[in-house]
Curated annotation (Swiss-Prot):
Catalytic subunit of the molybdopterin synthase complex, a complex that catalyzes the conversion of precursor Z into molybdopterin. Acts by mediating the incorporation of 2 sulfur atoms from thiocarboxylated Mocs2A into precursor Z to generate a dithiolene group. The gene is Mocs2B. Substrate binds at H101, R102, K117, K124, K125, E126. Keywords: Cytoplasm, Molybdenum cofactor biosynthesis, Transferase. This is Molybdopterin synthase catalytic subunit. Heterotetramer; composed of 2 small (Mocs2A) and 2 large (Mocs2B) subunits. It comes from the Eukaryota.
Length: 362
């Protein structure tokens, strides 16, 4: 039977030994890994273990399967590993097997220890006496690929050999015969030049127009709400940044009109009703017709308030078009009306002809 566990407390070796005992087994082999108190002249206080538990248990189960495939006589297998802080002289890992003969038990435990160190994702950190932060250690048994800085920078041409040889290469084809450092330098210079060209075009597209051009010609027919000036971003991957945003009009640059109008529209106790009536009749009718506001209230102050709200709504919705909106007046509408044709009866036509004859005879 296989016994696999990752524990956070002290490992009970006697309990593991009891799991291995069997009537048919004549040998039991137990390996106990403990924490020593020194490493390279440094005094070790404790060890800390961390693990990817799901993957670790899966790999430990595979190790048990390999042990049974190589040594079919194994009866019981136990692999216990401790996680967290392990003080000096305490067990961090226990691997034990039981078999009818000692050779299978001893060889299987040795093989399991090597496989556990090289395959199972468990990481060890050593805590020293004068260094509470500690240092992570890598397993020497793990087959890490050995790379040097030079090998990482150079390309291994032997891995992709070119079997076909080409003779009589045309002169029009560009052939670069330089080392890696010179080639990298040329590529960097090319990328830098292309980036500078892109930055220059972007600045020309978004820069402020010349002061010699009249402002009226540039802003009158513009639908933009803001005028943004963009310049090159120095020492950064982004090459543009907003220097200033100039909002010439709109509700974002205006004061709180609603609060101010509510204060102004508050009726005063000493107001004369007659003056209010004359003022309303002289101005409000034309303003309401121009703003397309219907007079729903008899109170003049409320009617003015409705007109002001209408103006604020139009300006906030589209402030850049407020100077272009022109509504037709009543006088223009009357001029556009077609004259009504008069209808003449036969009797009236006869009278008109008789009158003309009399004037001619006289």
């Amino acid at each position: 039977m296989d016994h696999i566990q990752l524990v956070n407390s002290q490992i009970d070796i006697n309990h593991i030994h009891n799991l291995l005992i069997d009537e048919s087994c004549g040998a039991s082999s137990v390996f106990v890994g403990t924490t020593r108190d020194n490493f390279d002249g440094k005094k070790v206080i404790s060890l800390e273990y961390e693990s990817y538990e799901k993957m670790a248990l899966k790999e430990m189960s595979k190790i048990c399967s390999q042990l049974r495939a190589r040594w079919p006589d194994l009866k019981h297998i136990a692999i216990y590993h401790r996680l967290g802080t392990v003080p000096v002289k305490e067990a961090s890992v226990v691997i034990a097997t039981s078999a009818p003969h000692r050779a299978a038990a001893l060889e299987s435990v040795t093989f399991a220890v090597e496989q556990l160190k090289s395959r199972v994702p468990i990481w060890k950190k050593e805590i020293y006496e004068n260094d509470t932060i500690g240092e992570w250690k890598e397993n020497m048994e793990c087959p890490w690929p050995q790379y040097s800085k030079a090998s990482l920078r150079t390309f291994d041409f032997s891995s992709c050999k070119i079997k076909q040889t080409i003779e009589n290469i045309p002169d029009k084809l560009v052939q670069i015969r330089v080392n890696d450092s010179d080639l990298n330098k040329r590529v960097k210079c090319f990328l830098k030049r292309k980036r500078d060209e892109i930055n220059l075009h972007n600045i020309n597209d978004f820069k402020q127009q010349s002061s010699q051009i009249p402002c009226e010609e540039t802003t009158t027919f513009s639908c933009a709400r803001t005028q943004s000036f963009l310049v090159k971003q120095q020492q950064s991957s982004g090459h543009l940044k907003v220097r200033r945003a100039n909002n010439c009009c709109g509700p974002q640059v205006r004061p709180n009109y609603s609060l101010q109008l509510n204060k102004l529209m508050t009726p005063q106790s000493d107001c004369d009703d007659l003056i209010e009536y004359k003022l309303g009749n002289s101005r409000l009718r034309n303003i309401e017709a121009y703003m397309c506001v219907s007079p729903d209230d008899d109170n003049i102050l409320n009617r003015i308030k409705n007109i002001e709200d209408r103006i604020l709504l139009i300006e906030s919705t589209s402030p850049e078009y407020k100077h272009f909106v022109q509504f037709g007046t009543d006088s223009e509408k009357t001029c556009l009306k077609k004259p009504k044709k008069e209808v003449y009866l036969t009797d009236r036509i006869n009278e008109f002809l008789t009158k003309i004859k009399r004037e001619i005879e006289q």
